[in-house]
Amino acid sequence: MQKHTGYIVPNKIIKTIIPVFVFLITFSEIHTQEQPVLKDIFKNYFLIGAALNEAQVSGEDTLCAQIVKKHFNTITSENALKWEFIHPKPDMYNFEPADRFVEFGEKNNMVIMGHTLVWHAQTPRWVFENENGKPVDRETLLNRMKDHIQTVVSHYKRRIKGWDVVNEALNEDGTLRQSPWMKIIGEDYLVKAFEYAHNADPDAELYYNDYSLENIPKRDGAIALIKKLQSQGIEIAGVGLQGHYKMDWPTAAQLDSTIKDFAALGVKVMITELDIDVLPYKDISAEVTLKVEMKGKIDPYKGGLPDSAQAALADRYKDLFETLVKNKDNVKRVTFWGITDKNSWLNNWPVPGRSNYPLLFDRNGNPKPAFDAIIGIVKNN
């Protein structure tokens, strides 16, 4: 009789090994599955977008470009369409960067947004001054505004879906900001800007865009402004809440009431520049020269965001997106101001050189817990 040299595994051990083996295979499959895509997750709710810079559009920043192509279905240009970039001199229009931005969106079947036509910032001084450096008269400034709006909007007619026609025209108390536009033309500069934009592209959607509209005084000012525009026959399609939020502001209730108040005017609401600042802010921008110990207090996460802060940010995004999802009939678009934490403007404002973590993707382009938190809202629904 031949001697058996094999090893017999007891049946009880086999019964234990098989379930563990199956679990490991299943666990591996789950974590190698395709990452959820934001634009697909929110397709029945609102457009989901990002603001792009030149490096991302040109392909120099391939990491961010790939994230944009995968996750977003609408784009806004950070700077290419602002006056100082596209119309830097009286007789000079520079369309090349903006053309690349629009072509990027068209190539990737994205809804393209124009930001911005009339703003007090990032507008060259020559717009408001004559050759002697003195303020121009009303008619001269109106003509310059008209030429700029008609030239830029016509150049992208039926290619750019909607425009932030006027940006940040209000003070915190809801009164009109005393910008050069206001001082030289008067408050009807807003009506004129919308009229010029509509005439240049009757099919384009026209928006008013501002920050801190979640605060009641400023919101009331915006409501009065929109009503005035509507009373003069302006077809304003929506209002943009910039969405540069803090960890404790606005509350979900403030955001909810803001959306409802604007929806009552018959306009859609868009979150146009969303990010959440995780760093200390109050009383720091006035200090020009920061001491080393002060720098540490206002830049506490230089080495990375701790798990506790990461979880708090995820909860914050979850609360905000629950409110947006609940108001999906009135919220048309949510656009993040940037793509990864690495390229966020908040790394250099209000204090240069800090490490901030305001977006859904980390510095290496990986989704953060905040990403999982917001997609979980829809999946759970």
Write out the residue ranges for each language-model feature.
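Short, solvent-exposed loop/turn elements at domain surfaces
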Residues: 56-62, 82-86, 143, 344-345, ...
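Aromatic-rich peripheral "rim/lid" segments of glycoside hydrolase catalytic domains that contact
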Residues: 155, 164-187, 196, 200, ...
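Boundary/entry segment of secreted carbohydrate-active catalytic domains
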Residues: 34-64, 68-74, 78
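Substrate-binding cleft and catalytic face of glycoside hydrolase catalytic domains
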Residues: 70, 74-88, 97-214, 280-282
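Noncatalytic carbohydrate-binding groove/subsite architecture in carbohydrate-active enzymes
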Residues: 39-45, 53-61, 180-296
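Structural preference for beta-strand elements that scaffold enzyme active sites
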Residues: 45-49, 74-76, 111-113, 160-164, ...
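Bacterial Sec-dependent N-terminal signal peptides
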Residues: 1-35
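Short, acidic/polar
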Residues: 56-71, 144-152, 218-229, 317-323
